[in-house]
């Protein structure tokens, strides 16, 4: 039986696109820091990383799609923070950004990672941006490396 498993060490360079939402930038900058830390620790060079900032989480899927279609990247990491407020806006944004990123992932030949926090309050977002619940930007970048290597292994 043949088993495929992604690795965190790559024989070939990996080019990563990162899409960051500027809304809740205080949180998103921590997610980006985590993602860049993960990539650096796994020998991804700065020249192989491109970061694009969009106004908010709702705009992430469009730019993720443009990056994926450009064929310049092996993976795209999407980072944002949607925090519940007192209106239903949160529900709509969460649903659409989730669907949008999933659609980009399914309709492109590269991994598109979901690193968008969807939290009830600012405390939960802070916890997931580098404190007691880890850093979801770091986790998303690690998953991107693993998925790129898994795809390369399957396509050998």
Swiss-Prot record:
- Broad class of enzyme this protein falls into: transferase
* Presence of the UniProt keyword Signal in the record: no
The chain's coiled-coil residues are none
Pathway membership, UniProt: Cofactor biosynthesis; riboflavin biosynthesis; riboflavin from 2-hydroxy-3-oxobutyl phosphate and 5-amino-6-(D-ribitylamino)uracil: step 1/2
Q: Which UniProt keywords apply?
A: Riboflavin biosynthesis, Transferase
Q: Tell me which EC number(s) this protein carries.
A: 2.5.1.78
Active site per database record? 89
InterPro entries reported in the protein's UniProt record: LS, LS/RS, LS/RS_sf
Q: What is this protein called?
A: 6,7-dimethyl-8-ribityllumazine synthase
Q: Which gene encodes it?
A: ribH
